[in-house]
Amino acid sequence: MHLPLPVRVVSLIALAFCAGCVGVPEGIEPVTGFQVERYMGRWYEVARLDHRFERGMEQVTATYELRPDGTVSVLNRGYRTDKGEWGEASGKARFLGPPDVAALKVSFFGPFYGGYNVVDLDPGYRHALIAGPNRSYLWILSRTPTPPSAEVERLVAKAKALGYDTSQLIYVKH
């Protein structure tokens, strides 16, 4: 099949752009010894850096479920304060390498993936620090809507040490 030149050029640009959307930010290491089964279930978003796809959302949760093929189904849900209604997005995640390294790519729209890297996780799998593909994306997650403040402070300090602008964190209402 022969595609017109403009279609090929746009496709190549889109592929090049998306290649930068997956991976681990420089100087950051994903968790090793990761046990995906223990990570499954519901997580509450405690804090995040601002980005358009969650802007104005409160009561945000992420629910993960392991599929038989080793991929992970993702359901993100939150209350849209501007519209006065609940919104949700479902997607899928795949490991970038071996499943004991917490570096994944997640897609909510067709073949377009973004980085999802667990960079801190307590031994009980109760609190997690998630890095996106660059330092513009960061989340603090917890198994409960109101985790201990000491744990949140620890994760914020870790994010700051990794080069994130933690003064820009948005703390999510539940």
Predicted regions and their residues:
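Bacterial N-terminal signal peptides that target proteins for export
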Residues: 1-10
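A beta-rich soluble binding module of mature secreted/lumenal proteins
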Residues: 2-3, 21-174
